[in-house]
Amino acid sequence: MSDTQKQQNFLQGTALLAMATANVKVIGALYKIPLNANIGEQGFSYFNTAYEIYNVLLMVSTAGLPVAMSRMISQASSLGHYNQVRRVYSVARTIFLALGISGSFLMTVFCRQLAAFQEQPDAWAAIGCLGPCVLLICIMSTFRGFFQGQGNMLPTSISQVLEAVTKLIVGIVAAVGLLKFTGSIPLAAGGAILGVTASCLLSAIYLFGCFRRSFRDLPITDEGVTSFGQTAKGLMVIAIPITVGSAGLQILTMLETKLYMGQLLGLGYLQAEADTMKGIYNMTQTIFNMPCAFITPITISIIPAITAQLTLCNDKGARETEESAARITGLISMPCAFGLAVLAEPVTALLGGYTGEKLALATRLMTVLGFAIMFNAVVLVTTAIMQAHGRAGRPVLIMFLGGLLKLAAVYILTGNP
């Protein structure tokens, strides 16, 4: 491990990722606001439907493995077992590639069937264009898991900003261009997705360049390594509970969309009206996710930090890291929660461009979602702490039960407006 990597402690890693997240969120707003203005709530709804399906496959492919990879590399690095670091990377890469190819094939080949299942048949172009991203994200995750396991957050941070800038430029140009030349909102939504695919490709190329240098510089050690099967088993033991929970929540989100759209259509709304209402809901969800994204750097940083401290039997250091993470989470989430709840109307008017009835609906949604930010932040950080301690099963069960409760609420409340 280089001197630069050794100097990156938990707080430095968190700060790097937080700065990258701030830039990514600003760029993301510059991407989604004009995108919503150009392709409308209908097109934005297709865009988000594609993302919901993509997220399910992404969770299956990458939710647990990067965490498992980060933990195992952190353990091996803290003990100076760099041959084992190489072994963990090699095994994880093989698993990632198999999952990525399968996910990309499913989204690309069966895009029309997936769109029909979601009660939005016109979303097929967006779903198909997003298919290659599953493989690209899997490739990127192998590199990010390697760096995060060594406590080096710089490549991940830079790649996130690079990804956001590319998505902004390519996505807006492609969406506006296709809308102008074809007049088709579904194709314009697909064009917006092309920006995501291009950004993933460029980010993967950058991470590969960083990885080659870092991997080549790993010290040569003489310790033995575990077999391919043993290493794969170790990864799976950590990854499967996390993957099941994350994928389960994304599947529940997909079912929520299907249920929501089915209920609206059953109440007599036209397809275009239902798509518009879902688009407004998706935009408020995007705003809700902005503050929560600043908690993610904390969760990414504390897993390898706590794992390394526990490996060296430094319980006091692990506890201090956990307390620091909790304090930072509170400082970020509480002002954001109250701010968005109180200023729901001007925020949705500015970021969503809504007026009239659309603004009234968005304001009501944003007020409720605003207060939920605090609870979501606590869930994210406590889940990461438990994962670092090797106790991933309990938060998975709790989140799954919460998802079922949400599904029941959507069914009851949407059917009785």
Residue ranges of predicted features:
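N-terminal membrane topogenesis motif
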Residues: 1-27, 83, 87, 224-249
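Interfacial transmembrane-helix starts/ends
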Residues: 11, 48, 81-98, 232, ...
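Hydrophobic alpha-helical transmembrane bundles that constitute the permease/transmembrane domains
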Residues: 18-30, 56, 60-68, 101-105, ...
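Interfacial/gating helices of multi-pass transporter permease domains
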Residues: 35-56, 185, 189-190, 233-238, ...
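Interfacial segments at transmembrane-helix termini and the short loops linking adjacent helices
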Residues: 112-130, 275, 341-373
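Membrane-interface helix-loop junctions in multi-pass transport and translocation proteins
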Residues: 154, 165-204, 393, 403-417
